[in-house]
Structures are given as C-alpha cells and as structure tokens.
C-alpha cells in the first residue's frame, strides 16, 4: 500500500486527507526527527485525531531530533564526522525510547491507534508494553537488520564495509536484538 508523509499540519492539509482517503490512502507516516520532514508534538496530536476520525492510522519514526542534532555537532567538533562508529553514539537507544514514550502519550491523549516504525531496542519495546497495558492500540514494525545484526558492524576496520550499515535508528547491541525476537513471539 501507499503511505503518504505528513510533514506539516494545518487546516488545508487536514482537508486534503479526505482526497487521500477517497483515493484509498489511509495510512500515513510522520517523523519526530529529520528537520525537513518532522512535525511537532501538537501537529502529531492533531494529525492522529484527524486520522482516527476517518479510520486511518499513522506510522511514526521515533527519535529525539534535538538531542541527536546536538550530539552530532559534538562528534563533528571532536573530529569524528567520518567515523562510522560515531553513528550509534549520536543516536543512542534511550533517545529512541524517549521519543517512543512521548509519541505513545500523544497517541493516548488523541485516543488514536499508532504504528511505531523501525523499533530497535528493549527500552522502546518496554514503552510499548506499558502503553498496551494502559489499553492503547499500538502496532510495532521492526526491520531485518535489527533482528539479524548487532552494533559490531559499525566497528569494522574497513570503513566502506562499516558504512554500509548506517541506518536510522542505528543497529543496536545484541541484547536489544534478543528483546526484539522475544517481542515477536
């Protein structure tokens, strides 16, 4: 299916949802990171409410953009801009978990179901369990790289090999991989 991105929110965009739904597009993607694509918490709340009213749903990429940007600036200042091992340092698992928890509280306030995309770690998965225990409808998507690989891929001495694994959120430590497999059961 098609997933349209919501990267801004206003009355005009809300009105466009009706056209999208008429065309059969009922799932949308939003980002809590990437400055060119992310929308603020209030916009996420409004979009979730509008989607719920129409029977739609949003998948949300959860990372804490502000702190990640600050960490990237620190790593660049330390001369590590081209260091692949700096990638997971800039985007630690707890910043993903914080964004997941924040999204879930926003979805709770909107009384709307939500999909968390690219979930990578145990702490974020725990936040999902807490939300489900509160009665929320939460769906989770992970990816093969998070189930099959661990963060050791970023420390390959061959830079071009290590760089192949740069993705966001990053591949995590092995204990997170095990938690994801348990979550699939």
Task: Name each model-derived stretch.
Residues 1-2:
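A glycine-rich helix N-cap at a beta->alpha junction
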Residues 6-11:
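Active-site beta->alpha loop and helix N-cap motifs at the rims of alpha/beta catalytic domains
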Residues 12-185:
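Histidine/acidic residue-rich metal-binding segments in metalloenzymes
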């Amino acid at each position: 299916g098609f997933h349209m991105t919501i990267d801004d929110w206003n009355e005009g965009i809300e009105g466009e949802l009706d056209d999208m739904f008429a065309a059969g597009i009922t799932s949308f993607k939003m980002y809590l990171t990437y400055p060119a694509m992310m929308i603020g918490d209030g916009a996420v709340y409004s979009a979730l409410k509008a989607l719920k009213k129409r029977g739609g749903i949003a998948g949300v990429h959860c990372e804490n953009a502000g702190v990640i940007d600050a960490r990237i600036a620190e790593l660049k200042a330390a001369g590590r801009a081209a260091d692949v091992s700096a990638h997971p340092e800039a985007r630690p698992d707890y910043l993903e978990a914080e964004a997941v928890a924040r999204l879930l509280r926003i979805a709770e306030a909107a009384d709307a179901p939500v999909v968390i995309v690219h979930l990578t770690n145990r702490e974020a998965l725990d936040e999902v369990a807490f939300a489900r225990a509160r009665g929320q409808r939460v769906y989770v998507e992970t990816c093969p790289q998070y189930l099959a690989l661990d963060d050791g891929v970023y420390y390959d001495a061959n830079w071009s090999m290590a760089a192949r694994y740069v993705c966001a959120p990053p591949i995590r430590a092995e204990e997170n991989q095990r938690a994801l497999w348990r979550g699939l059961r």
